[in-house]
Amino acid sequence: MGLPWYRVHTVVLNDPGRLLSVHIMHTALVSGWAGSMALYELAVFDPSDPVLDPMWRQGMFVIPFMTRLGITNSWGGWSITGGTVTNPGIWSYEGVAGAHIVFSGLCFLAAIWHWVYWDLEIFCDERTGKPSLDLPKIFGIHLFLSGVACFGFGAFHVTGLYGPGIWVSDPYGLTGKVQPVNPSWGAEGFDPFVPGGIASHHIAAGTLGILAGLFHLSVRPPQRLYKALRMGNIETVLSSSIAAVFFAAFVVAGTMWYGSATTPIELFGPTRYQWDQGYFQQEIYRRVNAGLAENLSLSESWSKIPDKLAFYDYIGNNPAKGGLFRAGSMDNGDGIAVGWLGHPVFRDKEGHELFVRRMPTFFETFPVVLVDGDGIVRADVPFRRAESKYSVEQVGVTVEFYGGELDGVSYNDPATVKKYARRAQLGEIFELDRATLKSDGVFRSSPRGWFTFGHASFALLFFFGHIWHGARTLFRDVFAGIDPDLDAQVEFGAFQKLGDPTTRRQVV
């Protein structure tokens, strides 16, 4: 049977045994990829600096997903939080990877078995003896089982009743750890940044799924509805399944890009909106002002800012700065962060404190402009020096560092001042090692950006797939030219025009 590549799946159209087989094989491939990818990432992952070289800077993709579900230790003796462990137990990163690979192998064998033994009694309609599936009943079974899994995850795993809990952090991604979470049953449970909503929503959705599954197992669909929605056609199942998948893909693309309790910034990196809104910058200034209010010096106040918080306030960690088609981790772009140089404070010769205007997300280059506390431009790095009025040299700008490696160091050399003004456009200033990985200096996106782009793209593709297969199953009779409810016996080939007795073919 010479089928074109886009129609090869018709070989399992009326073959329930082999339809099951290919789905088991698909599960084997997915699980095998997950386990293999985890082992690859563990082979290249450097856990030595969770503050300045976290998993998301290194381009880890599956490690963050394991971590958010409660895996923190490795058989290599390290912990994701930076400590060492002596007895990580079976559910370490390697243990989860191994479990996926073993499961993949079992699915592979099961797929082969079902391909060979495809003609099972369970797939035969006892009235006709032909292969058939009771699709509404199968729908009920799957709904019930997925409801049980959903309820179990929310009620046991997330709450810590039987399981580790999930990754929970503060709003600034500084104190994250795995801990049990109590369900949030009030309005706060609908806040996407409240972890308790994860538990309560899984419990509620799981309960609904169990009840809906029992309903579909015990109540048969009305005949009109059965016919209207083509419930006897396997392509209806394909269409509605694709709808469920693309809807889920759009949802998770949103929760990943805009941020939520399910996508902690410690595991996936900050969102672009945190840079756009100056989210971390505001918190840093709040902490510095609080230190000054306690009679600490400017240097002492800035020295109390955690490197982790300062590092979030750097444009190189903005997932929208990396191009969609630039391969590699963030570390392959601007380099591996080694240390925070400190916060630069610029002043002109009149004593005004100056603030460098920060680069917006979608700019590759941006003019260096320094403004005072009232937003008045006091200095800049001019494009045309002949017409300049506010150049660093003319205004006499100096820079002094507070906190970090250069704490207390000041510069009045214009070339050095301009160098740090340019770097201050990009947020807090860090020493970056570009030699180790031969980093090219071009920003890369984080796993947050890749996940969003991938899921949004496939969701769009699957949306069209849903429309395509939905139309095919709803209008099957129109496309085939045969009315599925045609009662009269039609002998194919007897008439020149199908079903028209006046056009009977002449026997030669």
UniProtKB/Swiss-Prot annotation:
Q: How is the cofactor bound?
A: Binds multiple chlorophylls. PSII binds additional chlorophylls, carotenoids and specific lipids.
The processes (GO biological process) annotated in the record are: photosynthetic electron transport in photosystem II
Stated membrane topology is: Multi-pass membrane protein
Q: Name one GO molecular function term.
A: chlorophyll binding
Q: Which domain of life is it from?
A: Eukaryota
| Gene Ontology CC: one annotated term | photosystem II
Q: Which family does it belong to?
A: Belongs to the PsbB/PsbC family. PsbB subfamily.
What's this protein's function?
One of the components of the core complex of photosystem II (PSII). It binds chlorophyll and helps catalyze the primary light-induced photochemical processes of PSII. PSII is a light-driven water:plastoquinone oxidoreductase, using light energy to abstract electrons from H(2)O, generating O(2) and a proton gradient subsequently used for ATP formation.
Q: Which HAMAP family match?
A: PSII_PsbB_CP47 (MF_01495)
Query: What is this protein's record name?
Result: Photosystem II CP47 reaction center protein
The organism that produces this protein has a lineage beginning with: Eukaryota, Viridiplantae, Streptophyta, Embryophyta, Tracheophyta
Give the gene symbol: psbB
